[in-house]
Amino acid sequence: VWFDFPADPALMPALSSAIDGKPMRLAFLSSDRPEAVAAQHRLVKRYGGVSPEDAEVIVALGGDGFMLEVLHLPLARRVPIYGMNRGSVGFLMNDFSEDGLTDRITAAEHAEIHPLTMTAVDSSGQSFTAMAVN
């Protein structure tokens, strides 16, 4: 499964590399867990890596809490996220494997999420709006 938000197709080049035969532009983000950090280094060495802003897909390495953290990033609104379990729970994550990553991403089931947005006003009267993902 890979997650993304509804978006204007012109703003979301998701998985276009898989269609035109170019290497997929992947950004690898990891939680602070040692096994996640080690996996990130191995995957970058094997598949290359780009900044999250230049990625077609963000690969999140950690557990469910880290997936929720990545979903809160502003760039998550325009880049699909493929999670691999390197945490303790992993209910939202795919099984971890270093092999065939781009094929697994291309074949993954797409899950479009529609989070609620929340607006709150603090005691000084300043308004804040955020996504409610959890």
Where are these regions (language model features)?
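Short, positively charged and aromatic/hydrophobic N-terminal segments
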Residues: 4, 8-20
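Short acidic low-complexity segments
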Residues: 47-56
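Short, acidic/turn-prone active-site loops that include or flank metal/cofactor-
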Residues: 86-89
